[in-house]
Amino acid sequence: MASLKEVKTRINSVKSTRKITSAMKMVASAKLHKAQGAIENMLPYERKLNKILTNFLSADLPVESPYIKAREVKRVAIVAFSSNTSLCGAFNANVIKMLLQTVGEFRTLGQDNILIFPVGKKVDEAVKRLGFEPQETSPTLSDKPSYQEASELAHRLMEMYVSGEIDRVELIYHHFKSMGVQILLRETYLPIDLTRVVDEEEKQKEEEVQGGEIANDYIIEPSAEELIANLIPTVLSQKLFTAAVDSNASEHAARTLAMQVATDNANELIQDLTKQYNKSRQQAITNELLDIVGGSMQ
């Protein structure tokens, strides 16, 4: 049995750890609240963009764009979102696992034809361990997502796709649903699937109270071609920003939950060690009393 001093030292050590995990939980919770605010502010804009595109497509107007043309995949780009720091449960491990599966599916293309854009230090480190050369991305897009940085990466991917440098772009990120639920997603970013955008908008319409419907016989100025040329890149930039914000909120939610579990475990361990300390102390006192009584009887 451990000595009283050893048990006391362990109790103090666990209490110190509990202070750290409790503080990290509060910090992560505050950051999560901020990230949720960013999502709430972003959603109306995203829905409006999708609604404009949906209304445009429902008018049966011709849609021509280099971003919707699918072709044989000879070179692929993968954009994976992780965190810059650890202590967030299985958040990063799940992203890396999904990345490994995705890379495995495209192995036949050859390593030189798989371009990985890591957003976050943890996935960047994993890419290097896999033997790939990570493509450069913004170092702050993971922990402080901004539309400007997301738009720059989106336009870079669009330029590579239009030029034929890559034939497909996939995203791997966590979608934030709630404090306890973050869904790992793998989605095709390019070529853009306009029918999916329409389906998402239709689902949103079903959840809303139906008002007056807008007629589909649009008069478009200056032209439908120019509208599409500007609208689809905007939708793609917004999509990448949405993934970054979703991933950021999911990270903080995962860290808040992980630190809560760590704090609860520390509390349980302190209780067990305190019981052990009291039991050892009681045993020591009993032994001393027996020694005193035994000595007086001699």
From Swiss-Prot:
Subcellular location: Cell inner membrane
Pfam families: ATP-synt
Chief location of this protein within or outside the cell: membrane
Membrane topology reported for the UniProt record: Peripheral membrane protein
GO terms under cellular component: plasma membrane; proton-transporting ATP synthase complex
An individual GO BP term: proton motive force-driven ATP synthesis
Segments traversing the membrane: none
Keywords of the record: ATP synthesis, Cell inner membrane, Cell membrane, CF(1), Hydrogen ion transport, Ion transport, Membrane, Transport
Record SUPFAM superfamilies: ATP synthase (F1-ATPase), gamma subunit
CDD domains: F1-ATPase_gamma (cd12151)
Highest taxon listed in the record's lineage: Bacteria
GO molecular function annotation: ATP binding; proton-transporting ATP synthase activity, rotational mechanism
Alphabetized Gene3D superfamilies for the sequence: 3.40.1380.10, ATP synthase, gamma subunit, helix hairpin domain (1.10.287.80)
Family: Belongs to the ATPase gamma chain family.
Task performed by this protein: Produces ATP from ADP in the presence of a proton gradient across the membrane. The gamma chain is believed to be important in regulating ATPase activity and the flow of protons through the CF(0) complex.
Oligomer and partners: F-type ATPases have 2 components, CF(1) - the catalytic core - and CF(0) - the membrane proton channel. CF(1) has five subunits: alpha(3), beta(3), gamma(1), delta(1), epsilon(1). CF(0) has three main subunits: a, b and c.
Protein name: ATP synthase gamma chain
Organism listed in the record: Bacteroides thetaiotaomicron (strain ATCC 29148 / DSM 2079 / JCM 5827 / CCUG 10774 / NCTC 10582 / VPI-5482 / E50)
